[in-house]
A protein has these predicted regions:
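Local beta-strand N-terminus motif with an aromatic residue
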Residues: 59, 163-164
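A short SAM/SAH-binding and catalytic strip from SAM-dependent methyltransferases
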Residues: 165-172
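Conserved glycine-centered beta->alpha loop in an early N-terminal alpha/beta scaffold
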Residues: 66
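Short acidic/polar capping segments at secondary-structure boundaries
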Residues: 97-98, 149-151, 172
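Short, solvent-exposed amphipathic alpha-helical segments in soluble enzyme
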Residues: 79, 160-161
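Glycine-rich SAM-binding Motif I of class I
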Residues: 69-74
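S-adenosyl-L-methionine
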Residues: 104-159
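Rossmann-like AdoMet
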Residues: 1-63, 77-114, 118, 138-140
């Protein structure tokens, strides 16, 4: 576990219209059809809603590397809350988190998303270590590790007592 928290450098974004682009990695955070892309690339192939509905446990856990703008999280939360009676625990690791200003811009692009609005209202701090949020009256639990992926995965391996039901691995 991270013994103390330190400041972590935020993502450096260049907003090209409604599209955030990482100046560090010269890569977009999401495409114009980002929500449909999450459905197509992550949710449908991994049958998240079907598998969450079928599990006997009261929760379903998704983990990913790279929280970015939280789009995968937001779309997953909307699907789980809207189509099942399960609690979603979403775990992510992020090396360069968004600034509060960027969270507000993301939320403005997704006014219909409860999770995007919640992250804009209470952004994750620019500090290393684990940060947690509860949303949708406790039906969505978010755990994000800010820092090096090896440190985050090490902590996860040491302390995550429940299985991860689905992993979202991006090609970044």
């Amino acid at each position: 576990m991270t013994p103390h928290r330190e400041y972590i450098a935020p993502a450096q974004l260049d907003w090209q219209g409604a599209q955030p682009v990482s100046t560090q990695f010269d890569d977009i955070y999401f495409s114009a059809d980002g929500e449909q892309e999450v459905q197509r690339i992550f949710l449908q192939p991994s049958r998240v809603v079907e598998r969450a509905s079928a599990t006997e446990r009261p929760w379903f856990t998704i983990a990913e590397l790279g929280f970015g703008s939280g789009l995968n999280f937001s779309v997953s939360a909307d699907e789980i809350v809207g189509k099942t009676d399960k609690i979603l625990h979403f775990i992510s690791i992020e090396a360069n988190p968004l600034t509060p200003k960027d969270w507000r811009k993301v939320a403005a692009l997704r006014p219909h998303s409860v999770t995007a609005q919640a992250l804009a209202e209470s952004p994750l701090p620019l500090l290393t270590g684990w940060h947690r949020r509860s949303m949708h009256q406790g039906r969505v639990q978010l755990s994000v590790f800010h820092g090096d992926v090896e440190d985050g995965l090490g902590d996860l391996a040491d302390f995550q007592q429940q299985p991860v039901d689905a992993w979202f691995l991006d090609g970044f």
